[in-house]
A protein has these predicted regions:
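Active-site-adjacent helical/loop segments in soluble small-molecule enzymes
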Residues: 7, 57-125
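Glycine-rich phosphate/pyrophosphate-binding loop at beta-loop-alpha junctions
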Residues: 1-71, 116-124, 128-164
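A generic structural signal for well-ordered coil/turn residues at beta-strand boundaries
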Residues: 47, 76, 97, 105, ...
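Beta-strand->loop->alpha-helix junctions that form or flank phosphate-binding loops
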Residues: 20-24, 82-84, 104, 183-191
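A conserved regulatory-domain signal marking ACT and ACT-like small-molecule sensing domains
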Residues: 139-205
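Short, glycine/charged-rich beta-strand-loop motifs at protein surfaces that mediate ligand recognition
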Residues: 47-50, 78-81, 100, 159-163, ...
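Short beta->alpha junction loops/turns
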Residues: 22, 85, 107, 135, ...
Protein backbone atom coordinates (compact mmCIF):
# COMPACT_ATOMS: atom_id res chain seq x y z
CA UNK A 1 0.00 0.00 0.00
CA UNK A 2 2.67 2.52 0.96
CA UNK A 3 4.66 1.84 -2.21
CA UNK A 4 1.61 2.49 -4.39
CA UNK A 5 0.74 5.68 -2.52
CA UNK A 6 4.34 6.90 -2.76
CA UNK A 7 4.50 6.18 -6.50
CA UNK A 8 1.24 8.05 -7.12
CA UNK A 9 2.11 11.06 -4.98
CA UNK A 10 5.55 11.22 -6.53
CA UNK A 11 3.85 12.02 -9.85
CA UNK A 12 0.89 14.19 -8.82
CA UNK A 13 1.92 15.76 -5.49
CA UNK A 14 5.65 15.34 -4.82
CA UNK A 15 5.50 17.95 -2.05
CA UNK A 16 3.46 15.56 0.12
CA UNK A 17 5.35 13.49 2.66
CA UNK A 18 4.41 9.86 3.25
CA UNK A 19 4.86 8.69 6.83
CA UNK A 20 5.23 4.91 7.16
CA UNK A 21 3.46 3.23 10.08
CA UNK A 22 3.98 -0.37 11.20
CA UNK A 23 2.76 -2.59 14.00
CA UNK A 24 5.67 -2.94 16.40
CA UNK A 25 5.61 -6.74 16.30
CA UNK A 26 5.88 -7.00 12.50
CA UNK A 27 8.01 -4.01 11.47
CA UNK A 28 9.62 -5.47 8.35
CA UNK A 29 9.97 -2.09 6.58
CA UNK A 30 11.76 -0.52 9.53
CA UNK A 31 14.15 -3.47 9.70
CA UNK A 32 14.81 -3.27 5.95
CA UNK A 33 15.45 0.49 5.99
CA UNK A 34 17.87 0.15 8.90
CA UNK A 35 19.75 -2.67 7.17
CA UNK A 36 19.46 -1.02 3.72
CA UNK A 37 18.26 -4.35 2.40
CA UNK A 38 15.31 -6.67 2.83
CA UNK A 39 15.52 -8.81 5.93
CA UNK A 40 13.39 -11.61 7.32
CA UNK A 41 11.98 -11.04 10.78
CA UNK A 42 12.43 -14.00 13.16
CA UNK A 43 8.78 -13.71 14.23
CA UNK A 44 5.73 -11.53 13.62
CA UNK A 45 2.79 -10.58 15.81
CA UNK A 46 -0.62 -11.61 14.51
CA UNK A 47 -2.85 -9.00 16.14
CA UNK A 48 -2.60 -6.79 13.05
CA UNK A 49 -2.84 -9.84 10.80
CA UNK A 50 -3.41 -7.86 7.60
CA UNK A 51 0.16 -6.56 7.79
CA UNK A 52 1.78 -9.53 9.53
CA UNK A 53 4.56 -10.28 7.06
CA UNK A 54 8.12 -11.26 7.87
CA UNK A 55 9.76 -9.64 4.83
CA UNK A 56 8.81 -6.68 2.68
CA UNK A 57 8.41 -7.36 -1.04
CA UNK A 58 11.32 -6.62 -3.36
CA UNK A 59 9.54 -4.20 -5.71
CA UNK A 60 7.67 -2.29 -2.98
CA UNK A 61 10.95 -1.81 -1.13
CA UNK A 62 12.63 -0.45 -4.26
CA UNK A 63 9.76 1.98 -4.88
CA UNK A 64 9.82 3.22 -1.29
CA UNK A 65 13.55 3.90 -1.42
CA UNK A 66 13.73 5.42 -4.92
CA UNK A 67 10.59 7.57 -5.11
CA UNK A 68 11.65 11.21 -4.73
CA UNK A 69 9.86 14.29 -3.42
CA UNK A 70 9.99 17.74 -5.02
CA UNK A 71 13.13 18.56 -3.01
CA UNK A 72 14.84 15.41 -4.36
CA UNK A 73 14.70 13.66 -1.02
CA UNK A 74 12.75 10.45 -0.44
CA UNK A 75 8.99 10.98 -0.47
CA UNK A 76 8.64 8.29 2.20
CA UNK A 77 10.10 9.39 5.51
CA UNK A 78 12.92 7.05 6.60
CA UNK A 79 11.74 6.98 10.21
CA UNK A 80 8.95 4.44 10.59
CA UNK A 81 6.32 5.17 13.25
CA UNK A 82 5.76 2.04 15.33
CA UNK A 83 2.42 1.53 17.06
CA UNK A 84 1.54 -1.07 19.66
CA UNK A 85 -1.61 -3.06 20.36
CA UNK A 86 -3.09 -0.54 22.79
CA UNK A 87 -2.55 2.38 20.40
CA UNK A 88 -4.18 0.46 17.56
CA UNK A 89 -7.17 -0.43 19.75
CA UNK A 90 -7.59 3.24 20.70
CA UNK A 91 -7.55 4.18 17.00
CA UNK A 92 -10.25 1.59 16.27
CA UNK A 93 -12.41 3.26 18.93
CA UNK A 94 -11.65 6.72 17.51
CA UNK A 95 -12.84 5.59 14.09
CA UNK A 96 -16.00 4.12 15.55
CA UNK A 97 -16.75 7.24 17.61
CA UNK A 98 -16.29 9.50 14.58
CA UNK A 99 -17.75 7.41 11.75
CA UNK A 100 -19.68 4.57 13.43
CA UNK A 101 -17.54 2.16 11.43
CA UNK A 102 -15.40 -0.66 12.79
CA UNK A 103 -12.05 -1.21 11.11
CA UNK A 104 -9.60 -4.05 11.50
CA UNK A 105 -6.34 -3.54 13.43
CA UNK A 106 -4.26 -3.14 10.27
CA UNK A 107 -6.81 -0.64 8.98
CA UNK A 108 -6.48 1.48 12.12
CA UNK A 109 -2.68 1.54 12.14
CA UNK A 110 -2.42 4.73 10.06
CA UNK A 111 -4.64 6.71 12.43
CA UNK A 112 -2.73 5.36 15.42
CA UNK A 113 0.47 6.45 13.69
CA UNK A 114 -0.83 9.96 13.01
CA UNK A 115 -1.83 10.40 16.66
CA UNK A 116 1.61 9.30 17.81
CA UNK A 117 3.48 11.36 15.18
CA UNK A 118 1.52 14.52 16.00
CA UNK A 119 2.06 14.08 19.73
CA UNK A 120 5.80 13.43 19.39
CA UNK A 121 6.43 16.35 17.00
CA UNK A 122 3.97 18.86 18.46
CA UNK A 123 2.32 19.39 15.07
CA UNK A 124 -0.48 21.93 14.73
CA UNK A 125 -2.33 23.39 11.74
CA UNK A 126 -1.27 20.71 9.26
CA UNK A 127 -3.41 18.59 6.96
CA UNK A 128 -2.73 14.94 7.68
CA UNK A 129 -4.54 12.00 6.10
CA UNK A 130 -4.68 8.38 7.21
CA UNK A 131 -5.62 5.61 4.80
CA UNK A 132 -8.00 3.02 6.21
CA UNK A 133 -7.13 -0.15 4.35
CA UNK A 134 -9.49 -2.77 5.74
CA UNK A 135 -12.48 -3.70 7.89
CA UNK A 136 -12.06 -7.45 8.17
CA UNK A 137 -12.96 -7.62 11.85
CA UNK A 138 -13.65 -10.83 13.73
CA UNK A 139 -16.59 -10.17 16.07
CA UNK A 140 -15.03 -12.28 18.83
CA UNK A 141 -12.06 -9.92 18.87
CA UNK A 142 -14.13 -6.84 19.72
CA UNK A 143 -14.22 -7.58 23.47
CA UNK A 144 -10.43 -7.77 23.60
CA UNK A 145 -10.11 -4.53 21.62
CA UNK A 146 -12.61 -2.75 23.87
CA UNK A 147 -10.66 -3.77 26.97
CA UNK A 148 -7.35 -2.59 25.53
CA UNK A 149 -8.73 0.74 24.33
CA UNK A 150 -8.57 2.34 27.78
CA UNK A 151 -4.86 1.49 27.95
CA UNK A 152 -4.22 2.95 24.52
CA UNK A 153 -5.98 6.17 25.46
CA UNK A 154 -3.94 6.41 28.68
CA UNK A 155 -7.15 6.22 30.72
CA UNK A 156 -6.25 3.02 32.55
CA UNK A 157 -3.10 1.45 33.93
CA UNK A 158 -2.63 -2.24 34.74
CA UNK A 159 -0.47 -3.29 37.69
CA UNK A 160 0.74 -6.59 39.10
CA UNK A 161 0.96 -6.19 42.88
CA UNK A 162 2.00 -8.42 45.76
CA UNK A 163 0.20 -7.73 49.05
CA UNK A 164 0.36 -9.54 52.40
CA UNK A 165 -2.07 -12.44 52.73
CA UNK A 166 -3.77 -11.07 55.83
CA UNK A 167 -6.93 -9.30 56.93
CA UNK A 168 -7.07 -5.62 55.95
CA UNK A 169 -4.47 -5.80 53.16
CA UNK A 170 -6.90 -4.98 50.39
CA UNK A 171 -8.33 -2.05 52.36
CA UNK A 172 -4.82 -0.68 52.87
CA UNK A 173 -4.13 -1.10 49.16
CA UNK A 174 -7.30 0.82 48.24
CA UNK A 175 -6.38 3.63 50.62
CA UNK A 176 -2.95 3.85 48.99
CA UNK A 177 -4.66 4.54 45.66
CA UNK A 178 -6.02 7.80 47.13
CA UNK A 179 -9.49 7.63 45.64
CA UNK A 180 -8.64 6.28 42.20
CA UNK A 181 -11.20 3.94 40.68
CA UNK A 182 -10.39 0.23 40.38
CA UNK A 183 -11.55 -0.96 36.96
CA UNK A 184 -10.43 -4.58 37.21
CA UNK A 185 -9.31 -6.85 40.02
CA UNK A 186 -7.99 -10.40 39.78
CA UNK A 187 -6.73 -12.32 42.81
CA UNK A 188 -4.87 -15.60 42.91
CA UNK A 189 -3.75 -17.36 46.06
CA UNK A 190 -0.07 -18.25 45.79
CA UNK A 191 1.18 -18.99 49.29
CA UNK A 192 0.24 -18.41 52.91
CA UNK A 193 2.15 -15.14 53.27
CA UNK A 194 1.54 -13.19 50.05
CA UNK A 195 -1.22 -12.64 47.50
CA UNK A 196 -0.67 -11.87 43.82
CA UNK A 197 -3.05 -9.19 42.56
CA UNK A 198 -3.64 -8.04 38.98
CA UNK A 199 -5.42 -4.69 39.12
CA UNK A 200 -6.60 -2.06 36.65
CA UNK A 201 -6.69 1.55 37.87
CA UNK A 202 -8.47 4.46 36.22
CA UNK A 203 -6.13 7.36 35.53
CA UNK A 204 -7.20 10.91 36.27
CA UNK A 205 -7.05 13.52 33.49
Amino acid sequence: LIAGVAAYLGDVAPHVKVIPVEYDESACLKAALEANERVILPSVGLFADGTAVAQIGEKPFDVIRLQKSDNSGPIVEPNVVLVNTDEVCAAIKDTYDECRSIVEPSGAMALAGIKKYVAEHGIEGKNMVSIVCGANMNFDRLRYIAERTELGERKEAIFAVTIPEQKGSFLSFCRALQGRNITEFNYRASDASAAQVFVGISLKN
